[in-house]
């Protein structure tokens, strides 16, 4: 890529600041306008609680609550979304939400099977230590795919973006199920994760399109309720596949079930898109040529970000296994080039990109900036200890696949249940900030208890208790991150701010996974070599790379005790680092706004009431 000179960059900046067609300038101006509007709205609300204050921000030039945006000023995807909202019946919406509920049920079920079986899949290829490396790659691709997918959903439509995501999802599952080596499995996992991320993102955008702000948290909480059910059956099903079939079938079966659950949603959305086309509702919408689309998707920025994160984080994760690799010129060059790519990415996004994937200027808005920081730290914390936690439970606490899954998913269960009840509380109180503030100490406490109760001498109850506490705090945080950023922008911009926070999230996950991989790969082999009996020291690498081999040593033997001690020592480091990152979330939470949600109606589809 050819870098522009400094003077050219300044000229570009001047043009962008003066160009009223700049999408990012519009969004920033919208935020400023909305902030002043909300202040007026709050004053009006005090005078009359019975009157809802509706706000709309349509462009940089003017503000009106009576004039809707012209179709020719809008992208096709937004027009399609509005048409669905304005012309569909409540029954159609109930069908869509029922399908979303089924889809969340299926993908959560599948995710639990995948999580329960992936340690055995990598062990089958002598690659158990690569769990964190695969997680790094998964998180990087999740970060890279969200901004362009959100824009594609605006340019072409929610339906088209959903179908693309579903295709990636299914191809990834097929590759994993048919893999003959760890490289193919990892590649399939990356595609699967990209599709999973896309499906979840488009569903979130759809729910934002069709729900009011006061109901947003409740709708999101209800959509996550399937996780509460599948947590208890997913690990059991995974164990049955492993014991009576193969881990491959535990993955392959979902290539049939997930598309089937999508059919009602696809049918309704396709029908109304066809009606919109037939009635001419899409005529005159903005058209984008390939060059403009290339700019809007910020392909150059995404390549720089993906390359930078991959070169730095994957190098750290892989090189940590052999300390000698830190002096290897190849790894040093990879890290240096990756760092330069990340620097170039930041500069490109700020000074060059017309439609930046990560609009850093938006982070100057306190709520958006604070939520991005919290999302980043939140997922670093989680992935610092999560990648090897499932193996830890089986090795140290002698759990079965089913029991390890139950304990691991106690966090998810508690988090989803908390999100549901939080939605009800917000619906009643119309406020959310103080729930945010209270959740941070709870989350830190849970992380700290994981340090204390990690040893073999503590029974399963001591493993479940921290997961419940972490789940309560984490459920509030995860739910409110999306709600908070959406209160400071109009619905036209839900996709971009949701994608912004959602992009920072997997970057945090990638960093956390790289940290856990670096610690695991550098410390665990040394602990095994130190703790194993002398007659098994030469087998330390084989033991290190296979969960199946680790579990083959029976309870009470010197070998198993040595493996347990090694796991416990490494787990202490992982959870201690995680607790430190969790503590850092105390600072940004105070910058989050605390509007009264009943006065914040940022809905562009106002010709009718929102369906939800």
Swiss-Prot record:
InterPro entries: MFS_dom, MFS_Str1/Tri12-like, MFS_trans_sf
Top-rank taxon, per record: Eukaryota
Keywords, sorted A to Z: Ion transport, Iron, Iron transport, Membrane, Phosphoprotein, Transmembrane, Transmembrane helix, Transport
Residues where Phosphoserine is found: 5, 21-22, 36, 41
Pfam families associated with the record: TRI12 (PF06609)
GO terms for MF: siderophore-iron transmembrane transporter activity
Stretches of the chain forming a coiled coil according to its record: none
Gene Ontology CC terms, in alphabetical order: plasma membrane
GO biological process: siderophore-dependent iron import into cell; transmembrane transport
Compartments (UniProt record): Membrane
Keyword Cytoplasm: no
Transmembrane segments: 91-111, 125-145, 159-179, 188-208, 218-238, 249-269, 299-319, 331-351, 365-385, 406-426, 434-453, 464-484, 495-515, 573-593
Primary localisation category: membrane
Membrane topology: Multi-pass membrane protein
Function: Involved in the transport of siderophore iron and so has a role in iron homeostasis.
Family: Belongs to the major facilitator superfamily.
Record-given protein name: Siderophore iron transporter 1
Originating gene: str1
